[in-house]
Amino acid sequence: MDATSKPAGKCPVMHGGNTASGKSVTEWWPNALNLDILHQHDTKTNPLGTSFNYREALKTLDVEALKADLRALMTDSQEWWPADWGSYVGMMARVTWHAAGSYRVTDGRGGANTGNQRFAPLNSWPDNVNTDKGRRLLWPIKKKYGNKISWADLIALAGTIAYDVAGLKTFGFAFGREDIWAPEKDTYWGDEKEWLAPSDGRYGDVSKPETLENPLAAVQMGLIYVNPEGVNGKSDPLATAAQMRETFARMGMDDEETVALTAGGHTIGKSHGNGSAANLSPDPEAAGPEYQGLGWINTKGRGIGRDTVVSGIEGAWTSEPTKWDNGFFDMLFKHEWTLTHSPAGASQWAPITIAEEDKPVDVEDASIRTIPMMTDADMALKVDPIYREISLKFKDDQDHFSDVFARAWFKLTHRDMGPKSRYVGPDVPAEDLIWQDPIPAGSTSYDVAAVKAKIAASGLSVADLVSTAWDSARTFRGSDKRGGANGARIRLAPQKDWEGNEPARLSRVLSVLEPIARETGASIADVIVLAGNYGVEQAAKAAGFDIAVPFAAGRGDASAEQTDADSFAPLEPLADGFRNWVKKDYVVSPEELLLDRAQLLGLTAPELTVLIGGLRVIGANYGGAAHGVFTDKPGALTTDFFTTLTDMAYSWVPTGNNLYEIRDRKTGAARYSATRVDLVIGSNSILRAYAEVYAQDDNREKFARDFIAAWTKVMNADRFDLI
């Protein structure tokens, strides 16, 4: 019998293959709380090991040699994927743009900070066709420099060098992005089940861009921002302009930056649609092993050079697509445009008439001239009144355009890196930028013991001290490294007025802590954290444990002038399960909102559990609510939350929306009240396993120490100077 006709063998393992397609736990119980987002990026998946320190490795990187190699790459055309016009500048700019452009300010997720473009789903998005080829072109450089340069940094740098080679004076560059080693599980890209599903499903009303579902910042599944062919693929530049304004705002960009990035992104390179997308192989994740992680290979033709298919739109935007100039605006405003279609059938705009010398040359044969094109997004810059005014200003002042673009590009590629203190390398700009959330250096020379003594004599309760410190620190987002206690922005607009910060209580507490800061030379940021630490120490002492909470001085105080109030609006907590509070009813359950906050804070599931139990018995609930305070000794850091939760002497009865009573099984008498967040600690099998550990008689001190460790982790989450 021929080998190819042998019957399939039975699985050699009785229970079946471990990679079989049987239902997962989450498929069997889709409504169960999925803690996977707290378990992702485990150090076991990192091949570099726990001892590897990327920032130390960066110190040995020959930056100038790396940049020289990247510059050489830009014109080193490869036969397997030849460069357009002999230059990869357009391609590399696109690889970088499509990595950084996935960032959204709403939750800080996406962006270029992790090298996530290497993994699903981004590596296989329809909008990312052939970015896989760009990364393969970069591989020899990554191979050469090894651990000294992360994929995330290399991808971000490649586009920056591309613009430099094209002739732009770039604004600068910072290293410091660390790679992840598996797809991110915490990022919500939408609930559609098909690529490029109509936009309607993610809008309340697709004609009103502001109704785009939060936290999304792209109009369709698999796109970076807008559909280049128009809303739902139907050309309408004005409607596209409205979607651009909203999606770019959700990336943290204003109108001027939007125009600059759109035009600058299309000043170099071209779009590819000279063929049929039906001839392309599957995307990288779906392709067979023989493709070795490459996707979209043309199976019925050359599929390279002038015959490449990417977006389906075909053509260049400018007369000289490898050169940084004002050619985009010249082309856009010099001609009248008509709607047409590419060879791949995509909608695009073509000039009604154009002089031969204005046409770009063919990517392979300079003796052939081709027709330039504009997308619906490009036409939006001409027809939208606000975009048009900005575009004309750029058209008439190339130096201004170049400066705005260079700054916007820097912002695009660095927005998710956090504060400037995380930047590494010789090309870090000296200028402080408002979107970097600058914070002055704080003092470390004051008398910490004297500050604690004043806090102890202040008359503030343990609950006041702990709640204020928690509220100050909980804004931290590990996604884009924003927020946190450093800077003490909780005392500034908009944070001082956020409902979740209990403005009246906050004002009262700050009126006591701020004079202490002035009198001692400490920053108010340090005093807020130190006060919270003191409160935790007192709670531990009340439980019988004399444990010092670690404290590192040096936080600074940001000013109102250093704070872009509007940009902090997305950091406002709409719920905080740690303080047992939700602003209003949401489609998402309170326990899922808790999970999201824990993930942004960088917490593990055990840390989430220990913090919930500790904050409840300390009495740190929003508004002093009694829900979940399962103790007769509030203010003491006891294990009572867990012992009560696991005690079968009690039953649990729903009493209203998100509310429950804990009743004595024998008498039926109500003992405590609780919320869904409280009860999920005992109902979820994983969280209950942790709760049982802390309910054990021999783990009372362990609980106190674990709580203090998790508390300190949150207080120091934004102390990048301590890393």
Curated annotation (Swiss-Prot):
Between which residues do disulfide bridges form? none
Give the CC-aspect GO terms: cytosol
Query: What EC identifiers does the entry list?
Result: 1.11.1.21
Where do we see the Tryptophyl-tyrosyl-methioninium (Tyr-Met) (with W-97) cross-link in this protein? 225-251
| Reactions accelerated catalytically | H2O2 + AH2 = A + 2 H2O; 2 H2O2 = O2 + 2 H2O
Q: Which InterPro entries does the record cross-reference, listed alphabetically?
A: Catalase_peroxidase (IPR000763), Haem_peroxidase (IPR002016), Haem_peroxidase_sf (IPR010255), Peroxidases_AS (IPR019794)
* Domain of life (superkingdom): Bacteria
Any Pfam family the entry gives: peroxidase
Necessary cofactors: heme b
Name the positions where heme b binds: 266
Q: Output the PANTHER family linked to this UniProt entry.
A: CATALASE-PEROXIDASE, HYDROPEROXIDASE I, BIFUNCTIONAL CATALASE-PEROXIDASE
Give the protein's recorded name: Catalase-peroxidase
Organism field: Agrobacterium fabrum (strain C58 / ATCC 33970)
